[in-house]
Amino acid sequence: MEAEGLDWLLVPLHQLVSWGAAAAMVFGGVVPYVPQYRDIRRTQNADGFSTYVCLVLLVANILRILFWFGRRFESPLLWQSAIMILTMLLMLKLCTEVRVANELNARRRSFTAADSKDEEVKVAPRRSFLDFDPHHFWQWSSFSDYVQCVLAFTGVAGYITYLSIDSALFVETLGFLAVLTEAMLGVPQLYRNHRHQSTEGMSIKMVLMWTSGDAFKTAYFLLKGAPLQFSVCGLLQVLVDLAILGQAYAFARHPQKPAPHAVHPTGTKAL
C-alpha cells in the first residue's frame, strides 16, 4: 500500500532521471572540447591538439548516423552524433584559422628581419582537398577543404548504405566500423604524445572529461541495452583515455630535456 502511495513520486522522478541521462548523453560528448577550444583561442596555438581527433570523430559519427537507418537505436545517441559533427567542424575551423595565421606571421617576421632588400616573402603553397595529395591529407589551408572532404565522404558512404541497406551483414558491419572508429578516438593524441615525448599543449581537463564521459557512456550503453558494438567501443575508449593520462603522468615526472642548438620550427603540426 505504501509502495503504491509513493508511485506518484517515484514515476516522475524516474522520468526526470531518464531525461537527465539522455541530455547528458547528447551534450556530454562535446564538453571535453570546451577547455581545449578556449585554450587554442587564448594562446592562438593549436600545436598541442591533433586535428586527426576531429577526423576520427567525424568519420565515426557519420557512420553511426548511417547505421541508424539500418538498425534503429535510441534517439539521444543519434542526436549526440549530429551535435558532435558540428562541434568537430568548429574545432577544425578554429585550428585551421590559427595555423594559417601563425604561418603568415612567421613569414612576415622573416621578411622584416631580412638584411637583403631584394628578398621576397616565400609564400607556402596552398594545400587543397582537390589536390588529392595523400602526403598533405587533412593538412589543408582552408576550412572549406575540410567541409568538401566531409561532404564527399558522407555522399559516398550514404550511397553505399542506400544500396546495401537490406543486407543485415552490411548493417552490422557498418555499426562495427562506426564504433571501432570512435574507439580509436584517442589514438592520434596518444601517438602525438609518444612521438614528441610530451603532452605540452594538450588539455589535461579535456582528457579527464574524455575518461569520465566514456565511463558514463559505457554504463549508459549497458543499462539501456544498446547494440553490443556500442559497449565494446566504450570500453576501448576508456582504456585509451587511461593510457593518455598515464603518458601525462610519466612525461611530467621525466620531462624531455631540449637538445642543444635545437631548431623549433614555427607552426609545427600536431601529428
Swiss-Prot record:
Top-rank taxon, per record: Eukaryota
KW Transmembrane (keyword) present: yes
GO terms (BP aspect): phospholipid translocation; retrograde transport, endosome to Golgi
Membrane protein topology class: Multi-pass membrane protein
Taxon lineage: Eukaryota, Metazoa, Chordata, Craniata, Vertebrata
Keywords for this protein: Membrane, Phosphoprotein, Repeat, Transmembrane, Transmembrane helix
Name recorded for this polypeptide: Solute carrier family 66 member 2
Organism, scientific name: Homo sapiens
Residues bearing the modification Phosphoserine: 110
Gene3D superfamilies: 1.20.1280.290
GO cellular component: cytosol; endosome; membrane; trans-Golgi network
Membrane-traversing stretches: 8-28, 49-69, 76-96, 145-165, 168-188, 232-252
Protein localization: Membrane
UniProt entry tagged with the keyword Ligase: no
PQ-loop domain location: 14-80, 178-233
InterPro entries noted in UniProt: PQ-loop_rpt, SLC66/Scramblase_ANY1
